[in-house]
Design a protein with these regions (language model features):
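Short helix-loop capping/hinge motifs at secondary-structure junctions, enriched
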Residues: 58, 133-136
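A glycine-rich, hydrophobic loop/mini-helix early in the fold
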Residues: 46-78
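Acidic, metal-coordinating catalytic segment for phosphate/diphosphate chemistry
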Residues: 8-49, 55, 64
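Nudix hydrolase/Nudix homology domain
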Residues: 2-8, 72, 109, 117-125, ...
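The catalytic Nudix box helix
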Residues: 76-109, 127, 143, 152
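Short, well-ordered beta-strand micro-motif
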Residues: 26-28, 52, 128-130, 152
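Acidic pyrophosphate-coordinating catalytic loop
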Residues: 15-20, 85, 114-124, 182
Length: 187
């Protein structure tokens, strides 16, 4: 293993494109060998992905139209952190309630990942939510159309295996929990 430095030095950062939910950022950077290059990436901030378990052990899932792939997508509740959240745990509670109308007795962080750090700065924080019960109405964003359902955990795991659960965030959450369960929780 070489001791050569790997870090790039950011010389300039500018937003090339901005819209609700993300930005395209262009940076001028100096590589360790002195070469100056430009680098574009998607900047979308931190998000939470929640695996909500009902008292009977079923998983609360959402079905949502995804315009980019032009189909209904079955997924775990997920969304970006908001300034009013206070902390990531609060964001997990909020997203669960907003998207599903369910509330959890407790949330526990499973893991955090950078799903595409070659071209995006996104961080997904995964949570398991226990004791989830329907307590109210959804509070959806203007551009969300979401239907709520429940599914057996084993059915979701099988859907990942067969390719029927195609949402990458959700597939990772289901498989992480299948592999590590509560013992994989980090806080």
């Amino acid at each position: 293993m070489s001791d050569e430095p790997l870090a790039w030095e950011t010389l300039e950062r500018r937003v090339a494109y901005e819209c609700p939910g993300f930005e395209i950022v262009r940076e001028d950077a100096r590589l360790p060998d002195g070469t100056v290059t430009d680098f574009d990436y998607l900047s979308e901030g931190e998000s939470v992905v929640v695996l909500p378990l009902t008292p009977s052990g079923d998983v609360v899932v959402v079905e949502e139209w995804r315009q980019a792939v032009r189909r209904v997508n079955r997924a775990l509740p997920a969304g970006g952190l908001e300034p009013s959240d206070g902390d990531v745990d609060a964001a997990a509670h909020r997203e669960l309630t907003e998207e599903t109308g369910y509330e959890a007795d407790a949330v526990e962080r499973l893991t955090s990942v950078e799903p595409a750090n070659g071209f995006a700065d996104a961080v997904f924080h995964y949570y398991v939510a226990r004791g989830c019960t329907p307590t109210g109405e959804q509070s959806l964003d203007d551009d969300e159309t979401i239907r709520v359902d429940t599914a057996a955990f084993d059915d979701l795991r099988e859907a990942v295996r067969t390719g029927d659960l195609r949402d990458g965030r959700s597939a990772l959450g289901v498989m992480y929990y299948a592999l590590f369960g509560a013992e994989g929780a980090t806080g």
